[in-house]
């Protein structure tokens, strides 16, 4: 799909439009400090000053918010990223309504299911979110989640990997009770978890 990136490159040139295509969806692992990732990748030029600008399609629909680039030199090299509007909109609405962002939290350490994990746990597919640790007293612990469980569905939505799980939980508000489906020792187990509020990350 053809997309247009709108921004003010380098804070010098004023409103500028660049054109490119959507190169990929659901990009992750761009930052160690941000667990909530599912970026749109585009080759539309995004330079300093473009962050926060709109990424639109040829119909004028907002599809994302320009966010960052991947570069080894500091210059744009054809790999830019935007936050999907579906993720940005609820955050915007929370900030307008309350002045803060409240994310759901279950207090477990999650990882994606690799082929090695799938083989070790006798899973049919290398899909789902692997529970590596459960914090005592956290919502996940109270719901009955255990180490080595594999979460395959959250609130009726299939969970393909860690990113799916983290984003779905975070975008679901605290104090909501939602169903989980997990694979435990080859058996499908259904649980219900009441989400807590994710603690704020203290930046150094």
Feature annotation, model-predicted:
Residues 6-20, 26-52, 57-99, 103, ...:
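Active-site loop architecture of trypsin-fold serine endopeptidases
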Residues 57-58, 62, 87-204:
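C-terminal recognition in membrane/secretory proteostasis and scaffolding
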Residues 2, 8-9, 68, 156-157, ...:
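Short, surface-exposed secondary-structure boundary micro-motifs
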């Amino acid at each position: 799909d053809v997309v247009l990136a709108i921004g003010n490159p380098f804070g010098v040139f004023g409103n500028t439009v660049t054109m490119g295509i959507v190169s990929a969806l659901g990009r992750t692992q761009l930052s160690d400090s941000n667990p909530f990732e599912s970026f749109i990748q585009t080759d539309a030029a995004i330079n300093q000053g473009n962050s926060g600008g709109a990424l639109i399609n040829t119909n004028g629909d907002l599809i994302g918010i320009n966010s960052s680039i991947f570069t080894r030199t500091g210059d744009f090299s054809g790999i830019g990223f935007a936050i999907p509007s579906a993720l940005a909109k609820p955050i915007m609405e929370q900030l307008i309504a309350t002045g803060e962002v409240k994310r759901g939290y279950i207090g477990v350490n999650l990882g994606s299911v690799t082929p090695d994990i799938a083989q070790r746990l006798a899973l049919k597919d290398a899909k789902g979110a692997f529970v590596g640790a459960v914090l005592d007293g956290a919502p996940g612990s109270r719901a009955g989640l255990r180490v080595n469980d594999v979460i395959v569905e959250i609130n009726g939505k299939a969970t393909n990997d860690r990113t799916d799980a983290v984003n779905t939980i975070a975008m679901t508000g605290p104090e909501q009770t939602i169903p989980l489906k997990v694979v435990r020792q080859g058996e499908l187990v259904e649980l219900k978890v009441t989400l807590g509020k994710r603690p704020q990350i203290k930046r150094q």
